[in-house]
Swiss-Prot record:
<keyword id="KW-0133">Cell shape</keyword>
<dbReference type="InterPro" id="IPR032695">
    <property type="entry name" value="Integrin_dom_sf"/>
</dbReference>
<keyword id="KW-0732">Signal</keyword>
<dbReference type="GO" id="GO:0046872">
    <property type="term" value="F:metal ion binding"/>
</dbReference>
<feature type="binding site">
    <location>
        <position position="496"/>
    </location>
    <ligand>
        <name>Ca(2+) 3</name>
    </ligand>
</feature>
<keyword id="KW-0472">Membrane</keyword>
<keyword id="KW-0479">Metal-binding</keyword>
<feature type="binding site">
    <location>
        <position position="380"/>
    </location>
    <ligand>
        <name>Ca(2+) 1</name>
    </ligand>
</feature>
<feature type="glycosylation site" description="N-linked (GlcNAc...) asparagine">
    <location>
        <position position="784"/>
    </location>
</feature>
<dbReference type="GO" id="GO:0031594">
    <property type="term" value="C:neuromuscular junction"/>
</dbReference>
<dbReference type="GO" id="GO:0005927">
    <property type="term" value="C:muscle tendon junction"/>
</dbReference>
<dbReference type="InterPro" id="IPR018184">
    <property type="entry name" value="Integrin_alpha_C_CS"/>
</dbReference>
<feature type="region of interest" description="Disordered">
    <location>
        <begin position="1134"/>
        <end position="1153"/>
    </location>
</feature>
<keyword id="KW-0812">Transmembrane</keyword>
<feature type="binding site">
    <location>
        <position position="436"/>
    </location>
    <ligand>
        <name>Ca(2+) 2</name>
    </ligand>
</feature>
<keyword id="KW-0013">ADP-ribosylation</keyword>
<feature type="disulfide bond">
    <location>
        <begin position="94"/>
        <end position="103"/>
    </location>
</feature>
Length: 1179
């Protein structure tokens, strides 16, 4: 099928035409091959290299005998004898025959006068047109050269061009009948005037056949012009015609300023010569000097517009029944333009409208056609722009359709139809006439470089041109390349009252496509009975229901005299809609053809002539136990015209007539519905059900009959599904058929016939089965082969007031790590009257990693003691402090972690306190597992950054593979009486990251982690830090943290309980002696300094007389004597004592001898005698 690209509409003002064109394409059915006969195309071939087919024209002569001709121009045909040239071109006439090489050259240009002319490469046949049946023909040679002063120094050559007008029998008679036309001959020479006129590049006749119109695009420095000449000389109505001729620049004035084409930028003064002379007359081509140039607003800005490159005419363009002329200027203003001209009384063509192209170098105006597409009495304009292109949309070539709005062209927005890239779509246009006899003219558009070439046929209509082509002729089908370079239509050459189409090419071949007569068929279908009552069997056996069908056909055609006998093959298809849904038809035809299926019946009717009505009949019966009682049985009638087989046609045989064809714009199918008598649907016999999905939610399957709803997201509408090894998931569904308004129960809620639930599953879920809590409610569910679509039968019918709850079991095997959401689409369906909308149930999918992490420290209590020692003095780990070992265990109960991403086991190690002093010094980090069989992990960064010597016993144990020895647990003494700070002032502290300690993170990658991994970390307390900073602390808690991190591209990965905390308590060793690390000489100096201060103090006191004893008289000095109380009297003394000894009594007591001492009691007071005085002691 040919690709038919289409452009958008250009500008918004023409909204009426935009809408009407769309409606025309919408309501008229498509037709890829309509009534141009491709199989019976007539080919004609010319001389190789002659460009046979460059121009074509259909012609029909009436005198002296009727004959149809295919006129083909070959502008590179070899010269005739006597033409004094190699290639001159020519016009060929081909009869309507099956012979491909029976064309002959029309004798119109013999001989040559080389002193006045040159016919070498004159391109005779560059254009050819016919007036129609019994009319004249014009053909031109636009490169015909007129010469003067041949072989002299002042020789001139002017490419003026010329045309020939032939009689209807292809003969040239006197000038009154036709003859040779050279209007540029004898005019001013040079390419700025008429020296390169190129008359005949385009030529045509006016539709009333009174005028001959020429285009001369080389006039006035290729600005171009158009000329209208009277061609009806000698006719009886000559007196009623204007004399003419008429010319765009004025036939008498010859003023290029009167030519209205837009300007372009071909500027400057140009001299082209091959003569070394200062004589300006010897310049072959020149532009005017600035002083001699024409004055006016345009000047020579209007050069090179090529006005007259295409030409046409028509009535009703500007005013009703007034003839106007249209000329194309494809290079005007670099975009192209089209000018509508009218003739005035002064032999001039006056411009009335100038239509400009929209794109640079599009060639707008390269081709033209004038016709009334919508039959409104106003001629419309079709313009080709074959060089148009849209790079992004891949479009090439365009045709603009201007629909005439009562002679007003200012606000018309044209319809633009585009072709394929580089197709030259629009290089040729032709008005075909009424090709299908629908009352509207049609057009053809050539695209010679779309593949081997194509011709697009567009029909007219009351709404304008139909933008979708009714037929596409392809050069490949007839074996012609560059097919469609030239076109000619609008004339019936085979006598069947339908216009035909002649297509030329650049491949020296042309082809005629004859139009096939169009038949308009009428058909009727009669059904008995019109409604099916399943309770009333009427078949012959008395058990089943039968239906009689009668079909009748007739046809009409244009013209009414065309009345062939035709055969129509028809086919009846029963229960079409059900069959198209993939269901078994409910009908069986009792009479059917050998090749018919059970639900089909075919036949043939013969229509002998127009209006002949012929009928056929058949019977079908319904199947037993019909379930679908609400949907009508659709019977589809399709028919087609039986085409006689094409026999092999040999040259010399008489040209066969073309077979008729059915109207492609008339549907050839008809549908008829046969309804059932409806029961149980209320008094109005209309079943208005009210099926509703009351509940639909995802569930986890606990057991075969027990389900639990999944938790919901925050929105309350989306479930959360954790992908953790669940092979199945449930979908709970509850469907009801209850009245929507209990106060009006008859309004709806009727029985739902063929009630179904249609389930569409995503690619990640597959249907597995159905469960119901009540086996009676369990529906029948069937799925397709891929288990992605499920149909559940809810009942036929599902009764009023019914409710059913069931669970769909869905397999989760298709859920992958990339699955983030589950969406199941649900749609209730019934053939009862109810509008039902689809419903979606969704669930977010997340992958929960079943990882667990735990840790333990050995020992869990540590003590610090010893002496303060600097970092630089440390040599071995044993000098640091007590050893501690941390063991972190990670377990994985799910799939291997490397399928989900990369994981790391991290331990946050508090190695320093806030001021930067060492806290817990890491010695060694080892990872077992998580790396594959027999591999140990490498963690970073490396511990033991001070490179301290490792305990030799530990190294030896690791080399022998022996386990760590279990150290006895250390006990904390409860007594803290020796602590230098009182118990009330002691406090507890916690050293943790990142508040009170600085941490280093040891990260260990876990590769191929599928079971368990253990991380061992050995460290030692830094005694010096604790002795210096935490002597006043009652207890210290050192926290080590560990966690797991996973890096993955999976967005829905969830990791829970992936961290742990390992505390260790630290105390000051109560049995340790704190020895200050002070040098001995400092102590010695301190002792000496103390002695010196003491000596100075004694000397000072001595000088002050502190050590001199005061001397008093004996009478004034009290004497104290110690009295010894016998032991046996002491108890009596204590019993008689009535009070405490007063301080005044310690002054009257005297010591009894120099060697006597008072007795000290247990509380270090003197022991008293019976008299209350201290008891002296004896030696």
């Amino acid at each position: 099928m040919a690709r038919i690209p289409r452009c958008d509409f250009l500008r918004p003002p023409g909204i009426y035409y935009l809408i009407t064109s769309l409606l025309a394409g919408l309501f008229l059915p498509p037709a890829i091959a309509f009534n141009l006969d491709v199989m019976g195309a007539i080919r004609k071939e010319g001389e190789p290299g002659s460009l046979f087919g460059f121009s074509v024209a259909l012609h029909r002569q009436l005198q002296p005998r009727p004959q149809s001709w295919l006129l083909v121009g070959a502008p590179q045909a070899l010269a005739l004898p006597g033409q004094q040239a190699n290639r001159t071109g020519g016009l060929f006439a081909c009869p309507l025959s099956l012979e491909e090489t029976d064309c002959y050259r029309v004798d119109i240009d013999r001989g040559a006068n080389v002193q006045k002319e040159s016919k070498e490469n004159q391109w005779l046949g560059v254009s050819v047109r016919s007036q129609g049946a019994g009319g004249k023909i014009v053909t031109c040679a636009h490169r015909y050269e007129s010469r003067q002063r041949v072989d002299q120094a002042l020789e001139t050559r002017d490419v003026i061009g010329r045309c020939f007008v032939l009689s209807q029998d292809l003969a040239i008679r006197d000038e009154l009948d036709g003859g040779e036309w050279k209007f540029c001959e004898g005019r001013p020479q040079g390419h700025e005037q008429f020296g390169f006129c190129q008359q005949g590049t385009a030529a045509t006749f006016s539709p009333d056949s009174h005028y001959l119109v020429f285009g001369a695009p080389g006039t006035y420095n290729w600005k171009g012009t158009a000329r209208v000449e009277l061609c009806a000389q000698g006719s009886p109505d000559l007196a009623h015609l204007d004399d003419g001729p008429y010319e765009a620049g004025g036939e008498k004035e010859q003023d290029p300023r009167l030519i209205p084409v837009p300007a372009n930028s071909y500027l400057g003064l140009l001299f082209v010569t091959n003569i070394d002379s200062s004589d300006p007359d010897q310049l072959v081509y020149k532009t005017l000097d600035p002083a001699d140039r024409l004055t006016g607003p345009a000047g020579d800005l209007t050069l090179n517009s090529y006005l007259g490159f295409s030409i046409d005419s028509g009535k009703g363009l500007m005013r009703s029944e007034e003839l106007s002329f249209v000329a194309g200027a494809p290079r005007a203003n670099h975009k192209g333009a089209v000018v509508i001209l009218r003739k005035d009384s002064a032999t001039r063509l006056i411009p009335e409208v100038v239509l400009s192209g929209e794109r640079l170098t599009s060639g707008f105006g390269y081709s033209l056609a004038v016709t009334d597409l919508n039959n409104d009495g106003w001629a419309d304009l079709i313009v080709g722009a074959p060089y148009f292109f849209e790079r992004q949309e891949e479009l090439g070539g365009a045709v603009y359709v201007y629909m005439n709005q009562g002679g007003h062209w200012a606000d018309i927005s044209p319809l633009r139809i585009c072709g394929s890239p580089d197709s030259m779509f629009g290089i040729s246009l032709a008005v075909l006439g009424d090709l299908n006899q629908d009352g509207f003219p049609d057009i053809a558009v050539g695209a010679p470089f779309d593949g081997d070439g194509k011709v697009f046929i567009y029909h007219g209509s009351s709404l304008g041109v139909v933008v979708k082509p009714s037929q596409v002729l392809e050069g490949e089908a007839v074996g012609i390349k560059s097919f469609g370079y030239s076109l000619s239509g609008g004339l019936d050459v085979d006598g069947n009252h339908y216009p035909d189409l002649l297509v030329g090419s650049l491949a020296d071949t042309a082809a005629l496509f004859r139009a096939r007569p169009v038949l308009h068929v009428s058909q009727e279908i009669f059904i008995d009975p019109r409604a099916i009552d399943l309770e009333q069997p009427n078949c012959a056996d008395g058990r089943l229901v039968c239906v009689d069908i009668k079909i009748c056909f007739s046809y009409v055609a244009v013209p009414s005299s065309y009345s062939p006998s035709v055969a129509l093959d028809y086919m009846l298809d029963g229960d079409t809609d059900r069959r198209l849904r993939g269901q078994v038809p409910r009908v069986t035809f009792l009479s059917r053809g050998l090749d018919d299926l059970r639900h089909q019946s075919s036949g043939t009717v013969w229509l002998k002539h127009q209006h002949d009505r012929v009928c056929g009949d058949t019977v079908f019966q319904l199947q037993e136990n019909v379930k679908d009682k609400l949907r009508a049985i659709v019977v589809t009638l399709s028919y087609g015209l039986r085409t006689p087989p094409l026999g092999r046609q040999a040259p010399g045989q008489e040209l066969p007539t073309v077979a008729p064809i059915l109207n492609a714009h008339q549907p050839s199918t008809q549908r008829t519905e046969i309804h059932f008598l409806k029961q149980g649907c209320g008094q109005d016999k209309i079943c208005q059900s009210n099926l509703q999905l009351e509940r639909y939610q995802f569930c986890s399957r606990i057991s075969d009959t027990e389900f639990q709803a999944l938790p919901m997201d925050l929105d309350g509408r989306t479930a959360l599904f954790a992908l953790s090894g669940q092979p199945f998931i449930g979908l709970e569904l509850t469907v009801t058929n209850l009245p929507s308004d209990p106060s009006r129960p008859q309004a709806d809620g009727d029985d739902a016939h063929e009630a179904q639930l249609l389930v569409t599953l995503p690619a990640s879920l597959r249907y597995s089965g159905v469960r119901a809590l009540d086996s009676v409610e369990k529906p029948l569910c069937l799925s397709n082969d891929s288990a992605s679509h499920v149909e559940c039968e809810l009942g036929n019918p599902m009764k009023r007031g019914a409710q059913v709850t069931f669970y769909l079991i869905l397999s989760t095997s298709g859920i992958t790590i990339e699955t983030t959401e589950l969406e199941v689409k649900l749609l209730l369906a019934t053939i009862s009257e109810q509008e039902l909308d689809p419903v979606s149930v969704r669930a977010h999918v997340f992958i929960e990693l079943p990882l667990s992490i735990s840790g333990v420290a050995t020992p869990q209590q540590l003590f610090f003691s010893g002496e303060v020692k600097g970092e630089s003095a440390m040599r071995s780990e044993r000098e640091l402090g007590r050893k501690v070992k941390y063991e972190v265990t990670v377990s994985n109960q799910g799939q291997s972690l490397n399928t989900l991403g990369s994981a790391n086991l991290n331990i946050m190690w508090p190695h320093e306190i806030a001021n930067g002093k060492w806290l817990l010094y890491p010695m060694r980090v080892e990872l077992e597992g998580g790396q594959g069989p027999g591999k140990r992990g490498i963690c970073s960064p490396r511990p033991n950054i001070l490179q301290l010597d490792v305990d030799s016993r530990d190294r030896r144990r690791r080399e022998l593979g022996q386990p760590e020895p279990q150290e006895p647990p250390e006990k904390v003494e409860p007594s803290t009486s020796w602590w230098p700070v009182s118990s009330a002032e002691k406090r507890n502290m916690t050293l943790d990251c990142p508040r009170t300690a600085k941490c280093v993170v040891f990260s260990c990658p876990l590769y191929s982690f599928d079971r368990a991994a253990v991380l061992h970390v050995w460290g030692r307390l830094w005694n010096s830090t604790f002795l210096e900073e935490y002597m006043a602390v009652k207890s210290l808690e050192v926290i080590v943290r560990a966690n797991i991190t996973v890096k993955s591209s999976i967005k829905n990965l969830l990791l829970r309980d992936a961290s742990t905390v390992i505390p260790v308590m630290v105390y000051l060793d109560p049995m340790a002696v704190v020895v200050e690390g002070v040098p001995w000489w400092v102590i010695l100096l301190g002792v000496l300094a103390g002695l010196l201060v003491l000596a100075l103090l004694v000397l000072l006191l001595w000088k002050l007389g502190f050590f001199k004893r005061a001397k008093h008289p004996e009478a004034t000095v009290p004497q104290y004597h110690a009295v010894k109380i016998p032991r046996e009297d002491r108890q009596q003394f204590k019993e008689e004592k009535t009070g405490t000894i007063q301080r005044s009594n310690w002054g009257n007591s005297q010591w009894e001898g120099s060697d006597a001492h008072p007795i000290l009691a247990a509380d270090w007071h003197p022991e008293l005698g019976p008299d209350g005085h201290p008891v002296p002691a004896t030696a």
